[in-house]
Amino acid sequence: MNKFSVKLLDNRTVLNEILTGHWLISHSGLLQLGHFFKTVTQNNASESKETDRSESLLSFYDDNYNRIAPRSVSEIPEGSIAQINCVGPMMKYGNWWMLGANEVIAQLDFVNNLQNVAAIVIYIDGPGGAVSAISPFIDFAKRKKKPVVAICDASLSLHRWIPDAIADVQMADNDISARFGSIGVVSSWMDATKYYEEMGVKVHEVYPEESSHKNEIWRAIQEDEEKGKQMLRDMHLSPMAQKFQAAVKTAHPNLLEEEGVLTGRTFGAEEAVRLNMINRVGSMKEAMQVAKALAEAYNLTRNN
């Protein structure tokens, strides 16, 4: 009923995004990429395979907040709440090692179009992920038909931008481990030049006159590392960071722009509430109650 299959990406595609992509991710999340890199390179499976992760992503609750297990769409009672999980580092496309934005969006679209689902609660707990993963959520917000409440533990970097893009209300699920912020962008890569030189391998690159700007940042880094990095900041990282900051300010018009709020610092739940970064601290049941109230208000407005 609520199942969907997704063709997971092969090793080459995952490695390409890890090694060449830009990231909306916390420092701890960035360190996790080393583990994923090791896992991917040691795994000999290169064939794309079909899998189903819908059961771990999507649950349904009736209007009394009791979890239900409908076997078909017709068994979903009117006024139900859909609960979707968005947990762990994220790329744009799902793979064996990371959740994909495409998987979460597939479930959001599914419940967004179910008549008997009144509202959506999305549980967010992650350090961030690839910059490319945010666009599908921004696009979903344009076709959203129902209220969305985000309840979060770690809501950092990409996982901070996601609720800002799609949620009507944002909550922390605790005031102990919950963290918010890390609003910023980072580019990370590994330079294996010296390693290859010690192996006696020399890499040559030849460009025609018609490709004078091809790989210009990488070429500049090789010639003058700081100059090349400044080009990367100016041409790629700063524009992304500015869009991230603008999205945060749009989602939170009363945000207190204290030191670090928009430049990468992280905050606990109570501080996030004080800064108007989130609305409140509460439980999953309370998030569902808020979602139900929003749905009722939405229906009144629509009927009038």
List PLM regions with ranges.
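Assembly/oligomerization interface modules of large self-assembling protein complexes
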Residues: K142, L156-L158, G228-N304
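Acidic, His- and aromatic-enriched active-site or binding-groove loops in soluble protein domains
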Residues: D153
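Small-residue-centered hinge/linker elements
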Residues: M1-K146, R160-A251, L294, T301
